[in-house]
């Protein structure tokens, strides 16, 4: 039973209708030819895998910022948070996590706190690994106010394939660290804007696990630009 659980993960409810559609199309393909039917089976399994929602063990130690997404760190650089959040117009350290179509796309809160703002903005669909995706692509931004009064911003960004951002929370909601707050369908990116003076503890190219990998400690010092760069994928 444990071995089965290793390979078969729970599926997020957002994926049920997509798997149902893939399964229905697969049935039709089998009526045409078994070869197409088996291709449909493979695509249906992939769709189920894409919407998997495994449990995660979030570190309990206070003062940690946790990755909101599975994927790879593609950018670390200073940037001003999205204007629609109403945060101060001050550059903060932005850590970007790029998710391929093979990553789990359920998004988790990097810190615990109150959601003070949720702002959706339509946009383009450039490759999410590019720097300009933060400014130009469709996005949904959240501001989270922590217990100490500091704010952290996390931004869901649609990518070249992803065309649908889903957010489960509204302003006033209380989030626990590692709690699910949304997902992005079929490839995308998450940006985390660390509070002023907080340094990231990750590097470009590092693999991230949502709800588990530590991005930063809230007590760390000022960030330098030595890690600034870009990863193309």
From Swiss-Prot:
The record marks 187-188 as: Cleavage (non-hydrolytic). It is a peripheral membrane protein. The keyword Membrane applies. It is found in: Cell membrane. It is an enzyme of class 4 (lyase). Pathway: Phospholipid metabolism; phosphatidylethanolamine biosynthesis; phosphatidylethanolamine from CDP-diacylglycerol: step 2/2. Keywords: Cell membrane, Decarboxylase, Lipid biosynthesis, Lipid metabolism, Lyase, Membrane, Phospholipid biosynthesis, Phospholipid metabolism, Plasmid, Pyruvate, Zymogen. It catalyses: a 1,2-diacyl-sn-glycero-3-phospho-L-serine + H(+) = a 1,2-diacyl-sn-glycero-3-phosphoethanolamine + CO2. Its main location: membrane. InterPro entries: PS_Dcarbxylase, PSD-A. GO terms for biological process: phosphatidylethanolamine biosynthetic process. It holds the Pfam family PS_Dcarbxylase. Its EC number is 4.1.1.65. The modification Pyruvic acid (Ser) is found at residue 188. The active site is at 188 (schiff-base intermediate with substrate). NCBIfam families: PRK05305.1-1, PRK05305.1-2, PRK05305.1-3, PRK05305.2-5. This is Phosphatidylserine decarboxylase proenzyme. It comes from Ruegeria sp. (strain TM1040) (Silicibacter sp.). The gene is psd.
